[in-house]
């Protein structure tokens, strides 16, 4: 795991953009994408760039169960607003949170991941060191699966909803083994609220109680942190 410390999120996002641009130059065809506040400035850099994704595939980490793609709180809507409307891909995949058979949807998503191996996976990290919606205790061997969100994750995401009761209680997420299958992983973390999780990920034991700790065993992980998020490493 290579760590790059930057002054702030803006600088970190520019560094991440240059790395993504380089990987595309070297032939990357499939990007794994994340949502949330962490990658927003990276997506802004991409929108304002010369990059063309019309011959590339994107695969998102996760989606809430019960929200349509047109729901403003869905990750499908987030991606459309923040990236896809400006920079369309040849194909873009997100889990279908309205699938009638959620088990079949997870199997279908695994088939997509097998068909389009991810060259570069963009990640953030949760305060409890979750990646995707893989909460503490998730098996390192997990593939795409249905997740019951923890109270802490629901609370953290409630700021995006009118009231906490509106936050979905389940999501479909790529599993930890799914994430680890990416050829390269670029994880960004900014702000002091992420410092404990970053320290546990980098310096802690490799244990399923710290989902992101599995990244210690990946051959090519780049960690971009600002001074506050990287205070413990």
From Swiss-Prot:
Keywords: Carbohydrate metabolism, Hydrolase. Pathway: Amino-sugar metabolism; N-acetylneuraminate degradation; D-fructose 6-phosphate from N-acetylneuraminate: step 5/5. It catalyses: alpha-D-glucosamine 6-phosphate + H2O = beta-D-fructose 6-phosphate + NH4(+). The keyword DNA-binding does not apply. Its EC number is 3.5.99.6. InterPro entries: Glc/Gal-6P_isomerase, Glucosamine6P_isomerase, NagB/RpiA_transferase-like. The active site is at residues 62, 128, 130, 135. It comes from the Bacteria. The keyword Coiled coil does not apply. GO terms for biological process: amino sugar metabolic process; carbohydrate metabolic process; glucosamine catabolic process; N-acetylglucosamine catabolic process; N-acetylneuraminate catabolic process. One of its GO terms (cellular component) is cytoplasm. One of its GO terms (molecular function) is glucosamine-6-phosphate deaminase activity. Belongs to the glucosamine/galactosamine-6-phosphate isomerase family. NagB subfamily. HAMAP family: GlcN6P_deamin. Catalyzes the reversible isomerization-deamination of glucosamine 6-phosphate (GlcN6P) to form fructose 6-phosphate (Fru6P) and ammonium ion. This is Glucosamine-6-phosphate deaminase.
């Amino acid at each position: 795991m290579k760590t790059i410390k930057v002054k702030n999120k803006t600088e970190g996002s520019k560094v991440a953009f240059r790395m993504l641009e380089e990987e595309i130059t070297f032939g990357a065809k499939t990007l794994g994408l994340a949502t949330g506040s962490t990658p927003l400035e990276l997506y802004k850099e991409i929108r304002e760039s010369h990059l063309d994704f019309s011959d590339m595939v994107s695969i998102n980490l996760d989606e809430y169960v019960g929200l349509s793609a047109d729901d403003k709180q869905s990750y499908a809507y987030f991606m459309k607003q923040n990236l896809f409307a400006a920079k369309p891909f040849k194909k873009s995949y997100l889990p279908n949170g309205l699938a009638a058979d959620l088990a079949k949807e997870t199997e279908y998503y695994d088939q997509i991941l097998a068909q389009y191996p991810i060259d570069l996976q963009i990640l953030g990290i949760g305060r409890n060191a979750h990646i995707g919606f893989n909460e503490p205790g998730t098996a390192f061997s997990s593939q795409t699966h249905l997740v019951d969100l923890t109270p802490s994750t629901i609370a953290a995401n409630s700021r995006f909803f009118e009231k906490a009761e509106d936050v979905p209680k389940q999501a479909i997420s790529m599993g930890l083994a799914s994430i680890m299958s990416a050829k390269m992983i670029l994880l960004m973390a900014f702000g002091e609220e992420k410092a404990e999780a970053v320290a546990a990920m980098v310096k802690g034991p490799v244990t399923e109680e710290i989902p992101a700790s599995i990244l210690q065993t990946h051959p090519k992980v780049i960690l971009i942190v600002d001074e506050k998020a990287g205070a413990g490493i």
